[in-house]
Amino acid sequence: LLLPGRSGGGGGVVVVADGAGGKVLGVRRQGARTHWAITAIALVAVGRYPHRKGFGLSAEDRVAIDAALVATGTTSFADRRVTELSGGERARVLMARVLAGEPQWILADEPLANLDPGYQIDMLHLLRDQVGHGKGVVAVLHDLHHAVRFADHVVLLHQGKVFAQGSVADVLTSSNLSAVYGIDAKLFSDEEGTPQLLIKGKTAR
């Protein structure tokens, strides 16, 4: 997981030039939009482009597309035009497009943007499930609480540079959070042993 510092603290761009690159890396860009009045399922089908061997969709393509729609909970509006969907619905369709490509690695830039709290948790569990199936996931998040709960590895950016990287416990220390975010915070485990972050307030910097 890649965790930026304060807003505007630095980001990254991944460009895949090789036509077969989509088999290796699937990218979900922040603020990605579509102005085409195509259906959601047609947009998800675009994710199969790296696997296409001819015209039309193969049986394997259709299985992958259906699985991506189910995983993202977008089946119910798969036949609606993308331009008619809400921001949260479009965000889930765009993730479905990535999943349909069955990449080995997923780069998700702000995958929680425009999602309600419940769907944010669903998205994070979805990404964790991908890891459980042997995929690699790099996600850019600003919400520290989500990073604490779901990250295996954290890269903390500050002023466009790597400030610290490693496990959640090693990176999201009180001193690091104070230096980067200007907050008084500490990690702890709740009664069930789940890591949590307590933010007490701001610190003077």
Regions found by a protein language model. Give the residues of each.
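Catalytic Walker B motif of ABC-type/P-loop ATPase nucleotide-binding domains
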Residues: 106-110
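Conserved ABC ATPase signature
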Residues: 56, 81-85, 89
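A short, surface-exposed alpha-helical micro-motif characterized by mixed small hydrophobic
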Residues: 147-149
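ABC ATPase nucleotide-binding domains
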Residues: 178-205
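Conserved catalytic motifs of ABC-family nucleotide-binding domains
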Residues: 102
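Conserved ABC ATPase "signature" region
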Residues: 45, 59-77
